[in-house]
Amino acid sequence: MISLIVCSRNSTIPISLKKNIEETIGANYELIVVDNSQKKYSIFSAYNEGVKHAKGDLLCFMHEDIIYRNNNWGESLESYFMQYNKVGMVGVAGTHYLPAMPAAWWDTEIRSGQLLQGSVINGEYKVIGKDEWLEYKHIPTLVVSVDGLWMCFRRRLFDLIRWDDISFNGFHGYDTDISLQVWNSGYEVHIFWDVLIEHMSAGNAQLDFYKSLDVLYNKWCNLLPMIKGTEISEGEQTARLRIAELRHELFYSEYKLRNLCASRQYRWGGYLLKPSTIYYRMIKHLKRLLGLT
């Protein structure tokens, strides 16, 4: 049986999602909703609560803003875990290279996976594209870590791992941390290609997200860098590391600019030379280097 575990900002998940699961999973399952409407839990403690109540052989942790877009994915999932004895965890998108610095899984852009990305534009929800990273696709596709919108595990792994609500709080860093725990326990992390998920909202990394990356790096720095599922030369690693560094420099430059423009001194004309112009030029330069313009 598959246990589906959701941390919900409400007392339950939308009826439409329940119906979507029922119509597409194609396997025996139970649904465990951890009610976080009173903001009692971090994502770590909520998922630990879900593990306590789960009865399935496979545990799937999923966001509540997703839609399953293909049928019988649950049956395929059970078959996949039966076929590959070493796999402990699967996801739909992840990285082959995690550098020796605080970094998100997507920062180095050496990725595998697929998902549909949705967004609300001018008050109307629509699918804006399909993210598909196939360059490193093999069967099986090994990765260092996966994205947290959908992750499935063998139940018995939770005798060796747990959602680390001691080192972390809040709602960030949980996916990469648990991925590294799986590798450190002697099991593998794979991309599961036989489910297509539509993610109905795009992530928006803020300061608390980047702080969680610092905690993550301090915890796992002795294992980094880590490469799985492909080979990467030292020169390529250095180049990808620089990409990750530039992404972080860009965020902190934008963060400083936002704080500056919101400051009382700036609004009252305390800065005659308008340092925001300097930050703007810096951000523009970084975006150009990263190919974001």
Locate the predicted segments by residue.
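Donor nucleotide-sugar recognition loop
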Residues: 145-146, 155, 159-180, 187-198
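Short, well-formed alpha-helical segments that are part of the catalytic scaffolds
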Residues: 2, 6, 10-25
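A recurrent flexible, glycine/aromatic-enriched loop bordering the glycosyltransferase active site
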Residues: 121-153
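Glycine-rich, basic loop-to-helix element that forms the pyrophosphate-binding segment
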Residues: 38-54
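Conserved donor NDP-sugar-binding/catalytic core segment of glycosyltransferases
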Residues: 40, 67, 71-116
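Active-site donor/metal-binding and catalytic loop motifs
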Residues: 160, 185-211, 215-219, 233, ...
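Boundary detector for helix-to-coil junctions that initiate low-complexity/charged tails
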Residues: 230-293
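Short aromatic/hydrophobic "clamp" motif used to bind/position activated sugar donors
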Residues: 59
